[in-house]
């Protein structure tokens, strides 16, 4: 079945959804050959690619959103239309919409739940070449299938959460087995302790630290200059990136005081380095940085409040989309990660190239110049992209939750430390 372009999807609902999942009511929009010019009821304006594969188009097809824009005053009827409208099929579902979501009451631990199979399949491409610079996940103890001779005992939600925390991506364990929770927990704890023993004996390298070193080597070997900039930045830098108090991203900034904040991205200081190095270094200028960033995120499954980014950029000659895509391909092939490139847009840069692994966005890449460049004194062509290292690790090692790849006291290399 053909995917409908974005203009058809928004025409069917009269709504627009931002990158943060906020539904806006559209006041007016115009469609050119490849662009859509949108004016929201709240007064915001947007120019986006008329794409079939961008994040917003996918969300429209799956009828998913997080909240509504209060200034747009999206009605229940509008939401009902968004949830039930199908532009790719003739089947419709009647949905009852209420203004506020209902809060589910917590189920007491004494109430039993029906057992369900729990499995953590590895989603990343398996690597058998141990000579590569990318670390391979620690091997778990081989799993022997357990015969099912009696009905499985019911597990509470907290017990299921405990089992999920102890599972490794290589475990293939079904909860439809006649094992009490304590016995199952004991078996998984033993496996994880064995994993730690092997890791301590054979490797001793943290996945995130190892990936940082491998990425640094990749870019230095390709003549990029490594940058290490301050984590505390002037709040004015954020405003110059177009993030003012009216934007959604502004609410995610960790502010130290009225003049300083923790950097939410690496771009501001890289902009400054490009401007200064342009007076010193020969053409083209190629720089990169690997370091932590901070945002107040609410969606914990794919986002972290403290995360690690790599941003690379080149300014001057050779700054074409073809060269950017070639470098991205070389980088992800180096990490043995499958991907596809789709067009999208963002509030800061406008048109972007989204680097996707399935439904997971790995990066947004940009071909400059863009209007924002004037704020930083940049007047030359440039290309660049940013990747979240924890997301790369999640794909590389098949982690179900991104917290397993993060700076954490609860997990080490994806293994629970609460044993």
Curated annotation (Swiss-Prot):
Its EC number is 6.1.1.26. It catalyses: tRNA(Pyl) + L-pyrrolysine + ATP = L-pyrrolysyl-tRNA(Pyl) + AMP + diphosphate. Catalyzes the attachment of pyrrolysine to tRNA(Pyl). Pyrrolysine is a lysine derivative encoded by the termination codon UAG. Residues 101-157 are annotated as: Disordered. Keywords: Aminoacyl-tRNA synthetase, ATP-binding, Cytoplasm, Ligase, Nucleotide-binding, Protein biosynthesis. It is found in: Cytoplasm. It holds the Pfam family tRNA-synt_2d. This is Pyrrolysine--tRNA ligase. Belongs to the class-II aminoacyl-tRNA synthetase family. One of its GO terms (biological process) is tRNA aminoacylation for protein translation. The keyword Aminoacyl-tRNA synthetase applies. Residues 125-143 have a biased composition (Polar residues). It comes from the Archaea. Gene3D superfamilies: Bira Bifunctional Protein, Domain 2, Helix hairpin bin. The gene is pylS. GO terms for cellular component: cytoplasm. GO terms for molecular function: ATP binding; pyrrolysyl-tRNA synthetase activity; tRNA binding. Its main location: cytoplasm. InterPro entries: aa-tRNA-synth_II, aa-tRNA-synth_II/BPL/LPL, Phenylalanyl-tRNA_Synthase, Pyrrolysyl-tRNA_ligase, Pyrrolysyl-tRNA_ligase_C, Pyrrolysyl-tRNA_ligase_N. NCBIfam families: PRK09537.1, PylS_Cterm, PylS_Nterm. It is an enzyme of class 6 (ligase).
